[in-house]
Amino acid sequence: MEGRGRAPTVREILGKTEGYLQEKGADAPRLSAQLLLAKVLGLDRLGLVLAMDRPLSVEELDGYRPLVARRGKGEPVAYLLGEREFFGLDFTVTPDTLIPRPETELIVERALELFPQGALSRFADLGTGSGCLAVTLAVKFPQAR
């Protein structure tokens, strides 16, 4: 373990982080730990699972710890990662933007049901937050303005 002369592994750090975040009352502590460590290591979640026995460098731990501390204080994972997926598209998010919510995807699904391809020529998105609705509708209805 850490401090005994051996670098901690991905598995060990994820276990410690999950426990810490659980104590702090964070939502989805395991998922939070995985997403944050994957970000630091430049991996997706599958890559992280495949790297469970990989030791972590001091530099990687130094990049991870501040993110975990911020998550422990309640900061949303999306802000820590700087992005959030919405309807298959990645959006940049900061504390200055609203985080796209999964239930908002229902609006896009409903628009796709109501308007056959080519039928929607104009739409407006007011108070856009992250802009996820307008961008996603523009992708799904490229002829619309």
List the predicted regions and their residue ranges.
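Conserved SAM/SAH cofactor-binding pocket of Class I
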Residues: E105-R145
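Conserved AdoMet
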Residues: R30, L37-E113
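Non-catalytic accessory regions of SAM-dependent methyltransferases
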Residues: M1-V49, R54-L56
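Residues at secondary-structure transition points
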Residues: P8, L31, L98-P102, D125-T128
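Short, glycine- and charge-enriched coil/turn segments that flank and shape catalytic ligand pockets
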Residues: R4-A7, R54-G63, E113-R122, Q143
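A general structural signal for well-ordered alpha-helical segments in protein cores
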Residues: L14, A33-Q34, Y64, V77, ...
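Short, polar/charged, Gly/Pro-enriched helix-capping and turn/loop motifs at alpha-helix termini
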Residues: K24, G47, A78, G118-S121, ...
